[in-house]
Amino acid sequence: MEYAHNKYIKKYEFGNPYDTGAVVACIDKTAGIPERFRFDAKTDTFFYTLKEKDMVFGLGETVRGINKRGWIYVSNNSDDPVHDENKTSLYASQNFLIVDNGKDVFGVFLDNPGSVTFDIGYTDANVLSIHPEYNDTSFYVIEGASPLEIIRTFRELIGKSYIPPMWAFGYGQSRWGYKTAGDIREVAAGYKELGIPLDMIYMDIDYMQDFKDFTINPERFPDFENFVKEMKTEGIHLVPIIDAGVKIEEGYDVYEEGKANGYFCKKENGEDLVAAVWPGKVHFPDFLNEEASRWFGEKYKVLTDAGIEGFWNDMNEPAIFYTEDHLKEVFAQVKEFEQKELDIWGFFDFKDVVGSIANNPEDYRRFYHEFHGQKVRHDRVHNLYGFYMTKSASESFEKICPDKKILMFSRASYTGMHRYGGVWTGDNCSRWSHLLMNIQMMPGLNMNGFLYSGADIGGFGGNTTEDLMMRWVEFGIFTPLFRNHSALGTREQELYRFDRKEDFRHLIELRYALIPYIYEEFIKAVEHNEMYMMPLSLYTGKMSAAVRSKTSYWQERH
């Protein structure tokens, strides 16, 4: 255990906090209510009176600007690809924020893995309220002379950030729709022909046999191990996706082993939860169960033995297309609607029923984990699921390939996962507003230790344009994770497909010229618990400039 400086941190406990793994330091508990805050025991809500010049920033991967004042943010990892500035929850939950008015500054970290609502001057312009759905909370107050000092102290509290291999700072091309080895060869050849550097090609779900984790479709990817070697001779690493759901199929080894050993999440009656994602019906591994976590992590060996050195974990909020139980309820309700005349209100009720199938909140209350010897309902620890899936893989890599650095990043996350992998910001869209969102998210992610991070360059959903892609690449040059990714059915957006091919080549060449500097600064930020990308206002200490400098960053350290 590392020991932080207690004079800078005070820890308050409410209810029965879970040992989430977010914190690596030992902090003595302080009795009472957090300084500066008022606590309403009836509603389990903490209140802070905002001063006129208070700015609030942090909360990691969230919408809107760097100054979070004026909106509601809910830490509740959600599979929501059609997100905009009106959303309250995205794929990640990182409950660290700083309040600063230029004279008084402090930080707050709420270690609570359930849903937490931060109302930052939305309901009442002068009040910051923090409401955990279940108040089993470790509440940390962090003091310091400046925001940067508070960030460094917080980062000491949560531990050093993940460092990927150096090649992971190169340019990566991805698309949901590369279905065969031939498709991937075509992409590699397209970049090679134009002399555009390329280090990674990502493999989405189509490489799998029937969307089953840790399988290869032998017809689409014959002799996979030699194909991996072939790509490496071209200087390209293949990076496959791994999803959270395990297909229910007799004879499928991952399913059979998980079922036989009780490694899947269970309902209250002890039966394995049946949900659905890409393969159809699936079980979810119980990553919070240490034995199940070790088992799943060992499965990555199938791919590392074939020469794979990088992965991205997806669908690990977990996303749920439906559960078997809820689908039965919906079908029963639909039958009732068949007997009714759907007036305006009946029609809206019908739409609500049908629209409630995917990612239904009740479904997240249907299953349980074995967590530190306790049976815990999922919704109380929901935000840990993606964290513990990535932890499972990372800890396994230390055993199955101890001499290699493995690229690992995830869609869902919680504070603490930054020690095991990076993040991408999920399924964005080809919109100028989403480029802006990418720019504005980076400081919050860095504050929470997620230094290896980035967005889908050009946008995942929708059809990008050449000018949007050009501007996004220009920004992406400076983000550690630099990946162009798009969805099935959208415009193909490999850089060689656009008219201004030479301009794109020059931009990617600039990125490669900067990699030694970027990597050095990244390592410094990890070692010194600093931000790799920080707003200029944080660097200068002039927080009043934060409103005017929403997209200006500083990356030099001494």
Residue ranges of predicted features:
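A residue-level signal for conserved active-site and pocket-lining positions in enzyme catalytic cores
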Residues: 96, 150, 154, 191, ...
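N-terminal small/glycine-rich loop or linker at the start of catalytic domains
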Residues: 157-174, 271-284
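Extracellular structured ligand-interaction cores
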Residues: 91-95, 103-105, 113, 136, ...
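C-terminal substrate/ligand-recognition segments
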Residues: 174-176, 184-185, 190-194, 199, ...
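Catalytic and substrate-binding clefts that recognize carbohydrates or anionic sugar/phosphate headgroups
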Residues: 1-165, 175-177, 181, 188-193, ...
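Short, hydrophobic/amphipathic alpha-helical packing segments
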Residues: 73-75, 90-93, 185, 293, ...
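Glycan-recognition and catalytic regions of carbohydrate-active enzymes
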Residues: 69, 73-80, 413, 495-558
